């Protein structure tokens, strides 16, 4: 008797299960590409300045792509920063897609959040190694830039997710409360 090969289940780390595979592959490509260029760029490109610039460009592309494209398409979240020109105050604005109109796959969610939290942890590890080695302060500056960009996105998307969950809960409670009051009022009038 032949056994059927197991079909991948939603939520597994398999890019083919993604609702947006191209978005996911670019997202992971930028995240992994910056780390690989930092770690192995000097082996293939002998010019340190070129490795620094390429790594910085990949980090910038990762920051932009995650903030403006991948977050919105993979998990339905987006954030930006607004500055009040008169007072100079800075506020973060969070946006989430309507959960009733958009379904987010478990695979996309898992890839997104895992990558979002693992990448800064890897950069922190590389920062510790750069401090221990003390071989070049310039490498530490590149890691500091990478940490600033990845941690900013991590904190912003974490807050955006909390905001999204709170607003979803508030909307469901509000709509449930309004409907129960409306139904109670109608039933009360019928049986008076």
Swiss-Prot record:
It is found in: Golgi apparatus membrane. InterPro entries: TVP23-like (IPR008564). The chain crosses the membrane at residues 17-37, 39-59, 112-132, 137-157. It is a multi-pass membrane protein. One of its GO terms (biological process) is protein secretion. Glycans are attached at residue 84. Pfam families: DUF846 (PF05832). Keywords: Glycoprotein, Golgi apparatus, Membrane, Transmembrane, Transmembrane helix. One of its GO terms (cellular component) is Golgi membrane. Belongs to the TVP23 family. Golgi membrane protein involved in vesicular trafficking. This is Golgi apparatus membrane protein tvp23. It comes from Aspergillus niger (strain ATCC MYA-4892 / CBS 513.88 / FGSC A1513).
